[in-house]
Amino acid sequence: MQATTQIKTPVVGKHVYGELYGVDEALLKDEERLRKIVIEAAHIAKMHLVEVNSWRFKGGDKEGVSVIALVLESHIAIHTWPVYNFATVDVYTCGEHSDPMTAFRYIVSQLSPKRFTVNYADRSFK
């Protein structure tokens, strides 16, 4: 009888990112609401939240909010440009059990863009 050995990939990296167009300007300025969205996205995607930081920037076309959640598996980030009704979303996870696409879809559902792009990159160690 021959033994079967399963070789595991040492690092499983899943990266989902995209751009959201036509998002409500007031929502893109609402730092507290964006923080709550990121926290819930981490929860439903089976990520372990370590810390959330956010910053509100004021001034013309540079105005916006950035929210970055450090999760045990990696990170979630939202950056907004309210004057353009535009946001970027970045969800990167390491590990087999977390689901960055679920987090991305949740964020999109909460921001309700008129249109969006989504990209996926396998960033696993091979």
Curated annotation (Swiss-Prot):
The keyword Protein transport does not apply. It is an enzyme of class 4 (lyase). Disulfide bonds: none annotated. The keyword Lyase applies. Is synthesized initially as an inactive proenzyme. Formation of the active enzyme involves a self-maturation process in which the active site pyruvoyl group is generated from an internal serine residue via an autocatalytic post-translational modification. Two non-identical subunits are generated from the proenzyme in this reaction, and the pyruvate is formed at the N-terminus of the alpha chain, which is derived from the carboxyl end of the proenzyme. Its cofactor is pyruvate. The record marks 73-74 as: Cleavage (non-hydrolytic). Pathway: Amine and polyamine biosynthesis; agmatine biosynthesis; agmatine from L-arginine: step 1/1. GO terms for molecular function: adenosylmethionine decarboxylase activity; arginine decarboxylase activity. Pfam families: AdoMet_dc. The active site is at residues 74, 79, 94. It comes from the Archaea. It catalyses: L-arginine + H(+) = agmatine + CO2. Keywords: Autocatalytic cleavage, Decarboxylase, Lyase, Polyamine biosynthesis, Pyruvate, Schiff base, Zymogen. Its EC number is 4.1.1.19. The modification Pyruvic acid (Ser) is found at residue 74. One of its GO terms (biological process) is spermidine biosynthetic process. Binds 1 pyruvoyl group covalently per subunit. GO terms for cellular component: cytosol. NCBIfam families: SAM_DCase_Bsu. Specifically catalyzes the decarboxylation of L-arginine to agmatine. Has no S-adenosylmethionine decarboxylase (AdoMetDC) activity. Belongs to the prokaryotic AdoMetDC family. Type 1 subfamily. Heterooctamer of four alpha and four beta chains arranged as a tetramer of alpha/beta heterodimers. This is Arginine decarboxylase proenzyme. It comes from Pyrobaculum aerophilum (strain ATCC 51768 / DSM 7523 / JCM 9630 / CIP 104966 / NBRC 100827 / IM2). The lineage of its organism: Archaea, Thermoproteota, Thermoprotei, Thermoproteales, Thermoproteaceae.
